[in-house]
Swiss-Prot record:
<dbReference type="InterPro" id="IPR007197">
    <property type="entry name" value="rSAM"/>
</dbReference>
<feature type="binding site">
    <location>
        <position position="74"/>
    </location>
    <ligand>
        <name>[4Fe-4S] cluster</name>
    </ligand>
</feature>
<dbReference type="InterPro" id="IPR006638">
    <property type="entry name" value="Elp3/MiaA/NifB-like_rSAM"/>
</dbReference>
<keyword id="KW-0949">S-adenosyl-L-methionine</keyword>
<feature type="domain" description="Radical SAM core">
    <location>
        <begin position="59"/>
        <end position="284"/>
    </location>
</feature>
<dbReference type="GO" id="GO:0051537">
    <property type="term" value="F:2 iron, 2 sulfur cluster binding"/>
</dbReference>
<dbReference type="GO" id="GO:0009102">
    <property type="term" value="P:biotin biosynthetic process"/>
</dbReference>
<dbReference type="InterPro" id="IPR002684">
    <property type="entry name" value="Biotin_synth/BioAB"/>
</dbReference>
<keyword id="KW-0411">Iron-sulfur</keyword>
<comment type="pathway">
    <text>Cofactor biosynthesis; biotin biosynthesis; biotin from 7,8-diaminononanoate: step 2/2.</text>
</comment>
<comment type="subunit">
    <text>Homodimer.</text>
</comment>
<dbReference type="Pfam" id="PF06968">
    <property type="entry name" value="BATS"/>
</dbReference>
<keyword id="KW-0093">Biotin biosynthesis</keyword>
<comment type="function">
    <text>Catalyzes the conversion of dethiobiotin (DTB) to biotin by the insertion of a sulfur atom into dethiobiotin via a radical-based mechanism.</text>
</comment>
<dbReference type="GO" id="GO:0005506">
    <property type="term" value="F:iron ion binding"/>
</dbReference>
<feature type="binding site">
    <location>
        <position position="117"/>
    </location>
    <ligand>
        <name>[2Fe-2S] cluster</name>
    </ligand>
</feature>
<dbReference type="GO" id="GO:0004076">
    <property type="term" value="F:biotin synthase activity"/>
</dbReference>
Amino acid sequence: MNDISSQTPGILATAREQVLQRGEGLSQEQVLEVLNLPDEQIEELLALAHEVRVKWCGEEVEIEGIVSLKTGGCPEDCHFCSQSGLFETPVRSVWLDIPLLVEQAKQTAKTGATEFCIVAAVKGPDENLMRQLEVAVEAIRAEVDINVAASVGILTQEQVDRLTAIGVHRYNHNLETSRSNFPNVVTTHSWEERYETLKMVKESGMEVCCGGILGMGETREQRAEFAAELASLEPHEVPMNFLDPRPGTPFADYPVMAGSEALKTIGAFRLALPRTTLRFAGGRELTLEDFGTEAGLLGGINGMIVGNYLTTLGRDQEADVDMLNRLSLPIKALNRSV
């Protein structure tokens, strides 16, 4: 008698038909199957993920720069974050002057980047921050040919409307991890509060940017859950961060995710989100180094943050651009959406 299991198509064969041919993302259960694949199948997974991203997103890679308008002093207890005022970390509260913000945007644009995101370490913006943000966005849009995004925490409907009115075309608010794992990561606000902000942003017409950090103690089951939750939002962009343990935070002693596990997660998320921009964000240098970064770019990733992150160092901007050129991956050109 033949082994029945040998007659059943593997998950990658199923994904080739479902995702590559029909453009239908994998379900939570199917994503878990991918995450449980042996390491020997990572190369096959990444090759399929690359085919999917080229077919449904195109060959171009979108480049983005980020800068912190307000660093540190945050009242929340996100256990991965050195900007929390509740932990003993080296980060201190500081505001960036608007002219310096504009200069950062100009430098980012010179790399070929189309996106520039202004970030603030807050639970949500007060009136002072909203006014600073309005001035900053206006100044950048007047002087720099780049799309402006924002990431300033949990919003009210009135704040969503104001950001839309000043020309913020994309809003980042990460869910960070799966709903079931969130209480292990943050206790001062809820996953639901973040989700509500994202729903308002989506309804406003701004593009939704929502991702998280991998390697924060979640199980593979919770990673699959997270992928399904993100897919339900139909975000324009999903930033994929990998935990870079920060001194003084509750996650300071967490192990760095294995590169093979990170690559498998990238491939799985691409198969769950075939039409979404998957962006390399913080932690890739530590988790994947150069070889793994290149493998990710040929395995489902089609966006990058260049330069430094909020509190950690990234790669040299020119080095990333050179890498894209070496891999024959074209940089996405600017398309003003607002």
